[in-house]
Each structure stands twice: as structure tokens, then as C-alpha cells.
């Protein structure tokens, strides 16, 4: 069952419709409700390798839906510590729970100050109004 539209206050957002949950020098990354809704049902997740590096504003993987193949754009730079195997095995998990079980990767941030460039939920909602 698809998730209802929501944008949790505790997350930081990127204008490319990604989110970050920051805990110390680590961050969990995923795509927003808006992104999964626009894509439709996800059928494949091409994840980065654990130990690889992701860069802010650059692609770190792909998701394929019944509508399109889309790059995943990282909101932060860092080393991939963990890939959500549940999403690799069942990509539709992102549609069902984009902020919970549908997270994509966990990273150790290499440039913690980048988080200051991310958007609050209020700022992200303004991006959505212009979308």
C-alpha cells in the first residue's frame, strides 16, 4: 500500500527530492514522498557499493519504476557504510514507507558542513509549490 503524503520535520531535504536524517557524523539518505509518487511503483534499485564514496549533488545510483529510470542524487558527500538490502530485494518498499523501511543508504559524512545547505521541511515545501 502506497504511503500517504508526508514530510517529517526531523529530516533535512534536498531540492532533488532526497532527504537526510543526520546522527553525529553519519546520515541515512532516501527519497521523499514526492519523488516516489512521481516515479510510480519502483521495480529496481541500483545501489552503490559499501565503501564507495558519494558526492553532494552527484548521482550515486538509480531507481527504475514502471514509468522511468532515474538517477539518485546525493544530498551529502561521504563514504557508504550500509545499503538497505530490503530495498534492493523489494524496491517497492520505498513506495510503501519512504522515510522508514524505504531508506536507501547510510553514509559517514566527509563534509559535515554540507548539511547547512539542505532545506528544512518548510523550505522544501516551497520547492514543491514550484514543482
Regions inferred by a protein language model and the residue ranges of each:
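Charged, well-structured alpha/beta interaction segments
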Residues: 55-71
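Acidic, low-complexity mobile loops and tails
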Residues: 1-59, 92, 96-131
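ATP/adenylate-binding site constellation spanning eukaryotic-like Ser/Thr protein kinases
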Residues: 74-77, 121
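Residue-level recognition of beta-strand microenvironments
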Residues: 20-22, 66, 83-86
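Charged, amphipathic alpha-helical coiled-coil/dimerization segments
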Residues: 77, 81-82, 88-89, 95
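Short glycine-rich, polar/acidic loop-and-turn segments at beta strand-coil junctions
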Residues: 33-35, 65-67, 76
Amino acid at each position: 500500500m502506497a504511503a500517504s503524503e508526508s514530510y517529517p520535520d526531523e529530516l533535512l531535504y534536498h531540492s532533488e527530492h532526497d532527504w537526510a536524517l543526520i546522527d553525529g557524523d553519519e546520515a541515512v539518505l532516501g527519497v521523499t514522498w514526492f519523488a516516489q509518487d512521481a516515479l510510480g511503483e519502483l521495480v529496481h534499485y541500483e545501489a552503490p557499493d559499501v565503501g564507495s564514496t558519494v558526492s553532494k549533488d552527484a548521482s550515486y545510483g538509480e531507481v527504475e519504476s514502471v514509468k522511468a529510470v532515474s538517477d539518485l542524487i546525493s544530498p551529502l558527500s561521504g563514504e557508504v557504510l550500509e545499503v538497505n538490502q530490503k530495498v534492493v530485494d523489494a524496491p517497492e518498499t520505498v513506495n510503501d514507507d519512504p522515510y522508514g523501511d524505504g531508506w536507501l543508504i547510510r553514509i559517514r559524512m566527509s563534509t559535515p558542513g554540507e548539511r547547512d545547505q539542505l532545506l528544512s521541511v518548510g523550505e522544501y515545501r516551497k520547492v514543491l509549490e514550484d514543482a
